[in-house]
């Protein structure tokens, strides 16, 4: 045994003593060495003893390092607590300033990221420290695995080169309530891709003219200079669907497909409350089934009658969360029940309530899409209600609802759950028209360029407008669809046109296009199909000759759109600011019977404070 090995043994003994091990368990260094050399000499394979010795030493050292590492996780997590969407909705971010460690969260500098940015999916998970009672001993570490589909913001297009703008209807509202969760519960700005302007606009109601007599839709136009860029004109297009009395709504066959996995534990009481609200509105001729998927797929109610609300509610109250997610198998069982209780001419619909984390079974997007599209052809639609945070899969739920001819909402609190379930049962979950498409042709003589604000996920090729086989959005009974365009008028200064359209040389191999001298500004076309039958689509055409006047509708919508531009840090936001839009919006509250507009001001102020 050489001097180096002797020194190693001395160091090892000292380290073991420093671990506060009882002294009587160890011999003196001299006795230990003597015994060591004696045993080593007797071993035919002395390397076994060395291995055992060093494994023991390594275990002792690693245990100490692990303790230090675990503590460092808490402290390193604090500075990023409000910089990513991993902030957990069920933990309030109001920390006690007296808490020595956690009080630093509210004062910690934000990570050097663009406003609303998010690490790309597939990057290392971000740890976030959340504490419900501002005590270190109760702190919990969560990982951010939320997913949002990337949005490439619409750009200005030249009417001379691209006079047609085509997109599908979208009456979803999930983005708005999800962003509210970030601002009010997470104390964080949302990731940019979580902000979909069309869902912000459609979260609110507007004073649109309603269809008369046997009309299915009305189209409303308004305009005003863009508050954030006066050289641009804002054009509002508001579509109003026919309202139907609740008594005249068709019978429903609802199949609730509920995720009861462990990730749903914190939000499950709200889920039960939301279902109870909907159960109260069931009519005697409505049917409801309940399927849960977690550790296993369970049918809790197989075709319960709306006349027996007590039985339905008892089944709802007995639900609980816990287990591993198996969404694919659950969806198969839900469609099986939907077919079993199918109502011809009725509202047959799967109602999915989940955080979107499908781990087992039909999990790939392609398999889910094929299944949902196939069942859609059988007049069984799918609506999605998202809940939860930290592991929320917005991209997957949005995709399923779009492919399933259904609507998509996010339930961030019990109040929203009650509101959504009440509204859904009076129209939104009852499809009035399917494959609703819009196409606007702008006159190059009047409009030099245009930009659609939002609807990035609903854009369509111009040729698809007249193709009835191309799927598009659905509009519920009495519902509204609102869209905003930014316009660069043909008589705008040349420097303004060049700013938004660029400086392109004249074409060399083709003659200039002939521009009509018509006094028309644009032609708006609305194409849709009736919910029943396979009759050809219907077409409605509206011609606008001049910029219409403004009302409270566009003034409110402009504030909502500006809010989304600020949250996304849009390259087209111009002089947009939270303060400016909040002042404008405060003058357009109107009756605000549901309190949504007043709450909007609260969200704007929260975002403004977070930005500072």
Model-based region annotation:
Residues 5-52:
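Positively biased amphipathic helices and basic secretion/translocation or surface-docking motifs
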Residues 27-41, 51-80:
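Single-pass transmembrane signal-anchor helices and their membrane-water interface zones
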Residues 70-131:
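Juxtamembrane extracytoplasmic segments of single-/few-pass membrane proteins
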Residues 85, 125-242, 575-612:
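Subset of Sec-pathway N-terminal targeting signals
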Residues 125-129, 158-161, 165, 174-180, ...:
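Long, acidic serine/threonine- and proline-rich intrinsically disordered regions
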Residues 168, 234-236, 253-255, 437-439, ...:
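Beta-strand secondary-structure signal
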Residues 184-189, 193, 197-202, 210-211, ...:
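Acidic, Ser/Thr- and Gly-enriched intrinsically disordered low-complexity segments
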Residues 217-436, 495-514, 591, 601-612:
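Exposed acidic/Ser/Thr-rich ligand/metal-binding surfaces
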